[in-house]
Curated annotation (Swiss-Prot):
Catalytic activity: Fe(3+)(out) + ATP + H2O = Fe(3+)(in) + ADP + phosphate + H(+)
Membrane topology: Peripheral membrane protein
Keyword Nucleotide-binding in record: yes
Residues annotated as domain ABC transporter: 7-237
Organism: Escherichia coli O157:H7
Protein family: Belongs to the ABC transporter superfamily. Fe(3+) ion importer (TC 3.A.1.10) family.
GO cellular component: ATP-binding cassette (ABC) transporter complex
Cellular localisation: Cell inner membrane
Principal location class: membrane
Protein name: Fe(3+) ions import ATP-binding protein FbpC
Keyword Zinc in annotation: no
Role: Part of the ABC transporter complex FbpABC involved in Fe(3+) ions import. Responsible for energy coupling to the transport system.
Amino acid sequence: MSQKNFVELRNVTKRFGSNTVIDNINLTIPQGQMVTLLGPSGCGKTTILRLVAGLEKPSEGQIFIDGEDVTHRSIQQRDICMVFQSYALFPHMSLGENVGYGLKMLGVSRSEVKQRVKEALAMVDLEGFEDRYVDQISGGQQQRVALARALILKPKVLLFDEPLSNLDANLRRSMRDKIRELQKQFNITSLYVTHDQSEAFAVSDTVLVMNKGHIMQIGSPQDLYRQPASRFMASFMGDANLFPANFSEEYVDIYGYRLPRAAHFPVQGSGTVGVRPEAITLSNHGEESQRCVIRHVAYMGPQYEVTVEWHGQEILLQVNATRLQPDIGEHYYLEIHPYGMFVLADAA
């Protein structure tokens, strides 16, 4: 059974003066799904978040939430909560007062506020922190307080504006897992903004990649990585080696190196094939067409990041550090594994 589209942007454009920041965007978020807007700085992703929140008004188009046109409604009229990058906590209030502030403004009784604050803090693993203050807890704990403050209101839509960007790597990992866990537990329709690909992949049902105010591609994290639609997508969704290729019914020919043709590849003509670094391995044996030379080696802990020269082109690949220790100038034979290959539709 298909899910109801809970948030919808129809032909939305946003201009600031003569600058078009969002250009005729159409976007839907199914009920209970986490959709992430991913893209480089200035691509328009935060503007979309602010449009959904009601902090900005579109120059053209309509915004719907739960089937209602909210284009001209304020944020207070949209039943939305936002988790900010800066946490936006009140330093003069206790954590319990911060979390319960929204309920207090809604006129909820003191006893109910107290009980719901206790439950909300427990959800984010901060049980018993009601009487502490912002300056007594870490950045990661502050972000969890901000999340509890949003969840306690049981909003129709939850918005995340780069919520993990101020945290270190270990805290980011644990916090993103907590966000995803709670979003799924409470089935909250959510829109998440980040410029971090791994973060987007970890929290999302669907990722929408933007560039210069346009949607470049929409899909699951797996689809975007395995089947990018353009050169921009291939490079933005991780490292990619791009090769000229010739296609036939039986094989793909890259610099004379023939590989079995995947079912979804063209059966004739030429084009561009992309290969992810993890789909290329090095061997001591092979055909002359596979021969390459090591140009650069970087030790990355469990693996080496290796650059080889192959038919005059520099290729990036990853080598398991326990299996091979390549040195600059050494010759090997590269092997391309079909699971990491894709064909690009654009030639630009």
